[in-house]
Amino acid sequence: MAVELISQPYYGFTYPILSDGVVKTFIHKSCEPKGFIRDILSFTENLIGIDFKAVKKQRNAELKFFEIPLIANEPTYVGLAVPYVSRVGNTWNLYVKTNPVSSKKWIYLHEFGHFLGMEHPFDDNDNDVWYGESTNDTVMSYNYQPSSYWWFRRADIDTITGMWVG
């Protein structure tokens, strides 16, 4: 497990959501590609034994996916994961910019990684900056390359299972 990729605040915020084994999930109609988002959820279900249950109303969801034209009034932002407390408890909104970018799948994986409790490899807020060979070894880096395959890396999978399995 790459402890350098664990964000204790994110992990702590997500823990109550995953503790009952079900995550009520909403994918907004603006999101593309929906199939890829469902693949991420299905893979994670099998990996850590969590059921991502689709809900029709976003107000009932604990995890929400959106595509919007402008994120946090920052034209350079392409994605953002926002944890907050709602009437259903701890909740995450994951935003991806609507512009047709070739890295959109990568951004969905990256923001979903935050939901799962992961941080950027270069974050040193908890004194555990990544010293691996390459930050390309994780979707939590900003080192997306157009030739990259769009899926979790071994370091990501090891970190996710280390946090959430047994």
Regions found by a protein language model. Name each.
Residues V3-L5, P16, V78-V85, V129, ...:
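Hydrophobic transmembrane signal anchors and adjacent membrane-proximal interface regions, especially
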Residues F26, F66, S141:
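Residue-level detector of conserved, well-ordered beta-strand and adjacent loop positions
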Residues L5-Y11, Q58-N60, T159-I160:
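Short alpha-helical interface patches
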Residues S103, D123-G166:
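Metalloprotease/metallohydrolase-associated module, dominated by Zn2+-dependent proteases
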Residues L18, G35-T135:
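Metzincin-family zinc-dependent endopeptidase catalytic domain
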Residues T25-E32, K97-N99, Q145-S148:
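Second-shell loop/turn segments in exported
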